[in-house]
Amino acid sequence: MNQPSKAPRAPRSSAATPKNKKKSRAELDQEAREHKRAKKRRGLASGSRTQVESTNQKNKAAAQAKDPRIGSKVPVALVVEDKPKAKPQPKPKAEAKPKPRLTPEEELAKLENDERLDALLDRIDDGETLSAEDQKYVDQTLDRIDALMEQLGIELGDDDEEEEEKREDILKLLKGGNPKDVI
């Protein structure tokens, strides 16, 4: 039987494909020990509190040794003395421009058209309780509106109704003569 002939191959060179040399058992054991030793020594060295100071003081042999556990040596006043403290000087602001002052009419119109105030008043009408901050805002804004209306001479319609009722009561007293009927 004739077998086909094999083509001659080129000899392998060691530079083309390097062979992985298997490590012996002793070499593997040695590497494992080194790896284990490196893993064991993680973290900070013990006694670092004293070692840090000792490395700094190697240069200063004449300096006295300090114990890092002892705190500050700043003197503490045992008796309270009343000394007026100097107030820090406020830094001058770079030409703070005053806000343009609104006329009372403009300010009143602005406050009456305030969306936040309207929303808060709607919440009050719905029976909700407001936070302290919101209630303070409502009170301040309504007080300012009242002050502006007084300044401008604007009166609310509620006062007119009360005055009319008082006049009617007085007329009834004068005509009827008996003050107990009115009450």
Curated annotation (Swiss-Prot):
UniProt key word Calcium: no
Listed A to Z, the keywords are: GTPase activation, Ribosome biogenesis
Residue ranges for the region (Disordered) are 1-114
Q: Where is the composition biased (Basic and acidic residues)?
A: 25-34, 92-114
The domain of life for this entry's organism is Bacteria
Q: InterPro entries attached here?
A: YihI (IPR007336)
HAMAP family attached here? GAP_YihI (MF_01058)
Assembly state and interactors?
A: Interacts with Der.
Provide the protein name.
Answer: Der GTPase-activating protein YihI
Tell me which species this is from: Serratia proteamaculans (strain 568)
UniProt lists the gene as yihI
